[in-house]
């Protein structure tokens, strides 16, 4: 006869074990090993008494379920697993990575406060900091967080939050989490780290002193490219405050189905990250010697400017790399046309390998929230443009062969594309000028 009693919570140190067991247990009614998917929007409330009031006011950190935007059993299971993987007290799962960033900032910042943030990070995040928070009366300093002195110099009496993304999207700058945590805490500020590119398998921000760690769960945590999600992990009291103030009021609730899909993906995260990292290193070495490539940036190469920090802070270098093409935009157009195993797409962390070209004039020069000095610093990493690569789970030799044939190819669009792009920019500039006049 099947024993359907609940097991005691899993206590393990290994990420591989936690990725499979944390937050999960056999269903107490059926014995099913796969966690159930709870798609209900509403739940039967407890009888009149303390539990009912807790469900309606969310006074406890795990109140009875009342409404799916406030909490859901599937999302709660995902939160337990993510908290265990990051070594945090609690986690809040949200609809997207940007919902996670927004929940953090709008919970802990108000008009008159000051935040220091990485000048290079995910586009949605840096645009939130550079464009939207100032409109709410929140002062923002965007700095190169790979230089702790810039963080220290940017501190103000009203600094409440330091926000770091490391490795930084898309240029792969690395920031010293431990050093910045010390700087932030001495000033009475919180430190939040977006660790999406590293995952808890390669980097543990909370253990290095961060207060909160953020992920776009859409990427590596899910791993299959089929579900949006985000998460913030940190102290239980702060996470509970975010749940009451940001999740309930701003509405970035994760779909239970997406939570279920991400939880499914997490079971293989340690294995996938090892494969991503191994293959990315092989591809980085190949590209580093290719005649069509002028520069490769990958944390696993000795040539990376922050290689010593990588060795001390990360257990492996991850699945993301960038490279510059000797042939510039024309070569990038040809590359996008001729790849076969790689897919030309902007996301990352999938089983399928992806790449995308970022022209510096479009993604850096046009950023109104960056100073001329900041743009010049970023150009030291990007040149006129970079190809960002998300190395998937295919065989590394097959991926190298695909890149090699595409890099050696020539195409008509690649020949005429740069001139057409320059003409389009002139037309857009003239149109903008006429609109201003």
Where are these regions (language model features)?
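PLP-dependent enzyme catalytic core of the Aspartate aminotransferase-like
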Residues: 2-3, 89, 130-131, 139-141, ...
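Conserved PLP-enzyme active-site core in the AAT-like
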Residues: 3-11, 19-21, 25-28, 90-290, ...
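Conserved small-domain helix->loop->beta segment predominantly found in fold-type I
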Residues: 281-354, 372-381, 418-425
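Short, well-ordered beta-strand elements within core beta-sheets of diverse protein domains
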Residues: 261-271, 318-326, 388-392
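Conserved N-terminal alpha-helix of the aminotransferase class I/II PLP-enzyme fold
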Residues: 42, 47-99, 124-131
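N-terminal glycine-rich, Lys/His-bearing helix-loop that initiates the first secondary-structure elements
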Residues: 1-62, 415-416, 420-437
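Glycine-rich beta-alpha junction loops
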Residues: 24-26, 39-45, 197, 219, ...
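C-terminal core of ALDH-fold dehydrogenases
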Residues: 12, 19-35, 330-371
